[in-house]
């Protein structure tokens, strides 16, 4: 999953947070 626009919404979308890149982004957010 590319989280829609890669990072946009990663902080609110739980599915995106589960992703490899978004998960790291969520962690540092």
Swiss-Prot record:
Recorded superkingdom: Eukaryota
This protein's GO CC annotations: extracellular region
A molecular function (GO) term: potassium channel regulator activity
Name this polypeptide is given: Kappa-sparatoxin-Hv1e
Domain comment as written in the entry: The presence of a 'disulfide through disulfide knot' structurally defines this protein as a knottin.
Source organism: Heteropoda venatoria (Brown huntsman spider)
Task performed by this protein: Inhibitor of voltage-gated potassium channels of the Kv4/KCND family. Blocks calcium channels (Cav).
Signal peptide (residue range): none
Tissue specificity statement from the Swiss-Prot or TrEMBL entry: Expressed by the venom gland.
Classification via InterPro entries: Huwentoxin-1
Disulfide bonds: 3-17, 10-22, 16-26
Family per record: Belongs to the neurotoxin 10 (Hwtx-1) family. 19 (HpTX2) subfamily.
Stored Pfam families: Toxin_12
Keywords: Calcium channel impairing toxin, Disulfide bond, Ion channel impairing toxin, Knottin, Neurotoxin, Potassium channel impairing toxin, Secreted, Toxin, Voltage-gated calcium channel impairing toxin, Voltage-gated potassium channel impairing toxin
Localization terms from the record: Secreted
């Amino acid at each position: 999953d590319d989280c829609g626009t890669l990072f946009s919404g990663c902080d609110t979308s739980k599915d995106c947070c589960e992703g490899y890149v978004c998960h790291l982004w969520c962690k540092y957010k």
